[in-house]
Amino acid sequence: MAMTSRERMLTALKNGRPDRLPCQVHGWMPYYLKNYLGGMDQWQAFERFGMDYAIYVSPLYSYDEKDMANWLVECKGSETDESGNRCEIYQITTPKGTLRKKVVHTDVTSYDTEYLLKELKDFEVWNAYYPVPRAVDFTPIQVTKDRLGDKGIIRSHPFSPGQGSPWQSFCTLFGTEASIMLGMDEPETLHHILESIVEKTLRVTEMWRNTPADMVEVGGGAGSSTVISPNFYREFGLPYDQRQNALFHEAGLKVVNHFCGGLMPMLDLVVELSRSSTRSKDPRSCEPAAYPSAIRPRVHAARGRLRV
C-alpha cells in the first residue's frame, strides 16, 4: 500500500524502508520561484512537481522590553554598488558600545561583506546584550501543520545567532578564517565563546517542548572537512552539537545536521552526533560500501544524507 508523504518521510528518517525514496528540495529559492516558476509560492511548487513537502517554519519569540532597549538595531543607510546590488549598513547600539555590519542583497541571495564582530572585545559586548527570548509561540507552526496535513513534514531552525550550531554561528559573526585562527592560537577563548553561544540556544530550546514541528536543522558548512580538519571539529564542534542535539531530541524532534561539504574523513564523528540525521554535499560515489566497516552498520545513506 502506498504511504502518504508524511509517512514516507518519517519512515525514512527512522531508518525504515518507505514505499519509495522521498522526493523534496532543501527549500525553494525566491529567485527561482519568481523567475522560473512564474511567481508561484513553495506550496504550489511542491504540488506542481508532485514532491513530498518539507515546509520551513519556526516559532515566534517574545523578548523582555529592557533587553530590546539594550540592543537597538538601526539601518544606517542603503546604497547601490557597481553591480546594481543593494548594500545596507546596520548599527547595533548597546550600553557598552556599538556593533556594525554590512549586508549586500542581490537578486539571488544576501551576504555579509563586513562581519558584526571585528575584535574579541566585540564578542563580550554581543554576549552581554544579545537578546534571548523569554517565551515562544508555536502558533505559526501549528497553523502550517494543519494546512500541510499528510503531505509532508515541518522543519524548524534553532534559536542561534548565525546558522544552526555554535561553531557555524560564530563563523558568521566573526569570519571563518579568523575563527579558525582563534581556535589554533587561543583555544580556551574559543571554547568560552562557543559555550556562551550554546547556552543561549539551550535556554530557548528548553521552551521548545511540545513543538508541533517534526525536525530541526542544525550545523553548517563551516563544520565540514572541506573547511576544517576532523580533529578541529572534534574539539570545537562536536561537544556543542551533541548537547543541543540531545535537548532537541528531548523535545521530540528529529535533528538534521547540515555539513554542506566534505564528510567522508569524519564519518566516525557523525556517529557520535547521536541519533541525528546528517546531510552533506558529498558526491553520489560516496555510497555505504565506501564507509569504514565499523561505521557501516550504524549509518544509512540516501543520496547524500546520512542517518545515524
Give the predicted meaning of each segment.
Residues 59-72, 77, 157-164:
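Short, glycine/charge-rich beta-strand/loop segments that flank catalytic centers
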Residues 71-132, 151, 157:
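A contiguous, low-structure linker/loop signature
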Residues 1-28, 32-35, 124-308:
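Active-site loop segments of alpha/beta catalytic cores
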Residues 26-28, 60-61, 92-98:
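Short, flexible beta-strand-to-coil junctions
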